[in-house]
Amino acid sequence: MPKIETPTDNRFVQNFIKNGGKFLYSENENEVNKNITLIIEENSWKKSNLISLDKNISKRFRLDYSFSKDSKDKTICLISTCEYLIADDGSILVSSNQVAEKKLDELPGDIIILAKTDQLINNISEGLSGIKNNSKSIPSNITNLKHFKDCNDKDFLSYGSSSKNLYLILLENQ
């Protein structure tokens, strides 16, 4: 009897939560706004502690758009989009389109990712192919966010990774 494969969206959510991520589903833009407000309230953040490197997000939520060494000290949370959501391991593929040339350890410890259901894919190979096919030029900084809870430095596979407190707000495509 053939093995029944779990749908891509279910597999992603299961692996994402297993990695320590916090998942919020939104049917429309109003729910996205409400979820962001709830996250901000839950963590007692101020808007001045939030930043985005995406002009559209910065404008939409009235956030700072610059990210310097000075702003890193007061910045608690980055709000960003992503390239793809990887179902096989529950990770989030980002590039210089979202995080500029910043390394993961240079980003704030708290991150809110805004994504749509059409960004769900099976594996990282599909994600890299998608970036190559959809980009005029391949982004210089491509990485994935996978460790959302404290990593054990004795775990060889997560050595050097920067764990993040990560929220994902997934918007249903209209």
Where are these regions (language model features)?
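The feature marks the mature, well-folded catalytic cores of soluble enzymes
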Residues: 1-174
